[in-house]
Amino acid sequence: MTKILLVEDNEMNRDMLSRRLARKGFDVAIAVDGREGVDMAQSGEYDLILMDMSLPEIDGWEATRQLRVSQGAERVPIIALTAHAMAGDREKALEAGCDDYDTKPIELPRLLSKIEALIGNHS
């Protein structure tokens, strides 16, 4: 089963997205801030990380930078999630080390196609 780490501080967004992904057959673990996300990503075996970019403790930009130079998570695909779609955000996310970028509100079919493009069909 494909393991996804969802790093999201907003409880409503977190619960909705984790339930929707679980219904699609993904094993979803949750981190509620950037620091917890970095710690979990370094200690766990995840196939993909969904990273909210507006997080407490350390934001998603910095968390992604840290993961890209850390042992254990440096090659795990990361999709940036943001509600603040500003010009240049996609480029900023890619420069920080994200593999793709998606905007909130999340459209599940669009997100699933991005996940599939990064990790292929999950089992």
What are these regions (language model features)?
Residues P56, E74, M86:
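The feature encodes the CheY-like receiver
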Residues D15-R23:
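Charged docking surfaces used in two-component/phosphorelay signaling
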Residues G25-V32, M40:
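Short hydrophobic/Thr-rich beta-strand motif most characteristic of the beta2 strand and flanking loop
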Residues S18, I106-I115:
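C-terminal output helix
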Residues E45-L50, L55:
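Active-site beta3 strand of CheY-like receiver
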